[in-house]
Amino acid sequence: MEKSTWTTKVGLAQMLKGGVIMDVVTPEQARIAEEAGAVAVMALERVPADIRAQGGVARMSDPELILAIKQAVTIPVMAKARIGHFVEAQVLEAIGVDYIDESEVLTPADEEHHINKHKFRVPFVCGCRNLGEALRRVAEGAAMLRTKGEAGTGNVVEAVRHARAVYSEIRRLQSMNEDELFTYAKQIQAPYELVKQVATEGKLPVVNFAAGGIATPADAALLMQLGVDGIFVGSGIFKSGDPVKRARAIVEATTHYNDPEIIAEVSKGLGEAMVGINIDQIPADQLMARRGW
């Protein structure tokens, strides 16, 4: 039963492949995202840039806001729960969200355990920085992965680092024999069966999107060319000068990621991009990507 349920959830996430998922904080923003071609929206009270700027404890959004956003659009609605906070996840499932993001953008609720995602009917998306993190999350029941990046910075460097790390590790696996795979599984603290599956198939068992710091159409196309299956855009759209135009442009660039002429065309006259932050200027205790284990 559990296996078939997980397979169904993975199939649901596959339906988002090649698309853009946008962070929204109001029903109006959700409508803009849907009209721009987003395949789903992430309902939030504050985008990551505001969470980063305002500090404090970041928790699950008010269910009333999530329901208002659900009523405003016909595309799937995601919402974030804190790492390890299975009751926030239970609440999100109870109000009918389509996907739950167990997210390092919120303040972690548990410093040892992630949520056991097999206990839920709703598919989960989780962040990863490398293959070990990716496969640990899949073992816990994640139906979809994303790079962690460094959310709320408008700086794509961490998302690139995480995507490259995952795909280079997959390529390494493919040249290993069974003995080496056993040892490697122990080194990256991932279940051997999953490691072996990835080595055999040459790909992750679930879709892997890029997230964290994507601010321009070129950023989105860069990650797609690196091999991700789709794009999450957080603060990059509604913290920019012309959100409607930028949202459409990022969708176009994600669809036509191998066509520089189209990317050039949609990148024209987008107005001011969000103000970015250099990663090395962020104090270590404020780096979101390090949250999770």
Curated annotation (Swiss-Prot):
Native organism is Chloroflexus aurantiacus (strain ATCC 29366 / DSM 635 / J-10-fl)
Record's signal peptide: none
Put simply, this protein is called Pyridoxal 5'-phosphate synthase subunit PdxS
Enzyme Commission no: 4.3.3.6
Question: Assembly state and interactors?
Answer: In the presence of PdxT, forms a dodecamer of heterodimers.
Per UniProt, D-glyceraldehyde 3-phosphate binds at R164
The record ties this protein, via CDD domains, to:
pdxS (cd04727)
The catalytic site is made up of: K80 (schiff-base intermediate with d-ribose 5-phosphate)
Q: Which GO terms describe its biological process?
A: amino acid metabolic process; pyridoxal phosphate biosynthetic process; pyridoxine biosynthetic process
Q: Which family does it belong to?
A: Belongs to the PdxS/SNZ family.
Annotated GO molecular function terms are:
amine-lyase activity; pyridoxal 5'-phosphate synthase (glutamine hydrolysing) activity
